[in-house]
Regions:
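Hydrophobic alpha-helical transmembrane segments of multi-pass membrane transport proteins
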Residues: 39-42, 180-264
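Alpha-helical membrane-protein architecture signal
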Residues: 9, 13-17, 191, 234-247, ...
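Junction motif at the cytosolic side of a transmembrane helix
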Residues: 6, 17, 213-229, 370-395
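Membrane-spanning alpha-helical segments of multipass transporters and channels
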Residues: 43-44, 65, 86, 251, ...
Length: 395
């Protein structure tokens, strides 16, 4: 009995060593598994480190040339979010500036603005935004809304019968409110999107590295290395091989995950409310699900380079399907079911709750359960695919 256990552990170590040696010797695999996870999170975090956009350039078309229009432009330019970069004589001139990407939006003040206000009629200020940059669009529209609300309040005070500041404040703002940011205290885009992106980077780099690894083996005609061939003569050979390979990748990505999920947020001062013990309990099923998922996809892809196309065309879609950048309640049921095939869906949801909302492991039982189910299903699939490949004598 002891000899069998010793032989089992020896075979696992042999598979572990063979996999580690293959990863280090293959430049493409080493690049995506060891180098890319070090620098890619830094690049993304650095891009979004400013959190919010400031001084977005805007073109103003003032057809009114009145005191009210000048007041609107002055208050609008005073906003920290936007900057009046150009004054244009027509909408067409402003549109050419947008086409050249010199400005991100247009504010049009109509000719009858002052006349309508003096007649106590409703006037319209038109705002045109470049929708290709959502943060710039938000800054332009929010600043215009704030200025128009403030000027509306001033007009109400001027027309109201009140005589004191207290009466005027009740007239313009009868219901006061206080906005409290519960989790994303900065209100920035980095704290909002980066936790999901970091979890997706772990899955996609694992998929890239494993896909290249198994793609090379398929091109060479075997999935079993020469050093592990003797294992095939023993009982449950595929289990021994898969276990060794899994432990190798788990060891590598344990270090990668600690760097990506713990070091990167601290380096760029992102919100981090997680508890280390809960993170370990959550990351274990996520890594196992990602490893077995990558093995399964890697053995299904016919050529080595095909995995790069898969990752490129799925990364943005998987981020949307995770429910972080778009509410899950607004995603069609078919796509919600499709998203359940990927570990990143539950990994991102669980990590956002742990990291940004300060949840405990007991609060993400559903995500953990789904990740364990995925790990089991993809483990069995990878085991069956490897057994089928060996049965067809690819080695």
């Amino acid at each position: 009995m002891f000899d069998k256990i010793k032989q089992f552990l020896s075979d696992i170590f042999c598979s572990f060593y063979s996999e580690a040696r293959t990863i280090v010797r293959d430049e493409g695999v080493a690049l995506f598994m060891l180098i890319v996870p070090l620098f890619y999170p830094i690049l993304y975090s650095w891009i979004y480190n400013n959190e919010v956009v400031r001084e977005v350039p805007v073109a103003v078309v003032d057809a009114s040339h009145s005191a009210q229009s000048r007041e609107f432009v002055r208050r609008y330019d005073a906003s920290p979010d936007v900057k009046v970069a150009y004054f244009c004589n027509s909408i067409e001139e402003a549109r050419r500036l947008v086409a050249k990407q010199e400005v991100n939006g247009i504010v049009y003040l109509p000719e009858d603005l002052s006349k309508r206000l003096n007649r106590m009629e409703s006037a319209t200020v038109s705002v045109y935004c470049d929708m290709s940059l959502m943060l710039a669009y938000k800054a332009i529209l929010t600043a215009a809304t704030s200025v128009s609300s403030l000027m509306n309040a001033n007009l109400q005070v001027a027309l109201a019968p009140g005589y004191t500041d207290h009466e005027n404040s009740i007239t313009t703002q009868p219901l006061n409110y206080e906005e409290v940011a519960m989790f994303n205290s900065t209100g920035g885009y980095g704290n909002f999107i980066l936790p999901g992106v970091l979890m997706l980077i772990i899955q996609q780099t694992l998929l890239l590295g494993t896909g290249l690894l198994y793609g090379s083996r398929r091109e060479r005609g075997f999935f079993i290395t020469t050093s592990t061939l003797p294992i095939l003569k023993r009982r449950l050979p595929m289990l021994r091989i898969i276990t060794g390979r899994t432990l190798c990748m788990l060891l590598i990505y344990a270090a990668v995950t600690a760097y990506v999920l713990l070091a990167i947020p601290k380096m760029f001062h992102f919100v981090q409310l997680l508890h280390p013990a809960d993170l370990v309990l959550f990351v274990l099923p996520y890594l196992l699900a990602c490893i077995f998922f990558a093995m399964t996809i890697g053995m299904l892809i016919p050529q080595r380079e095909d995995v790069m196309l898969v990752v490129v065309f799925t990364s943005v879609g998987l981020l949307f399907l995770s429910g972080v950048s778009w509410p899950q309640s607004n995603i069609p049921s078919f796509w919600r079911a499709f998203a359940c095939l990927f570990p990143s869906t539950f990994g991102i949801q669980g990590f956002v709750k742990l990291n940004t909302m300060g949840a405990l492991i007991s609060d993400i039982v559903y995500e953990c359960r789904m990740l364990w189910i995925q790990a089991l299903v993809y483990f069995l699939l990878a085991l069956w695919l490897l057994h089928r490949a060996c049965k067809k004598k690819y080695y």
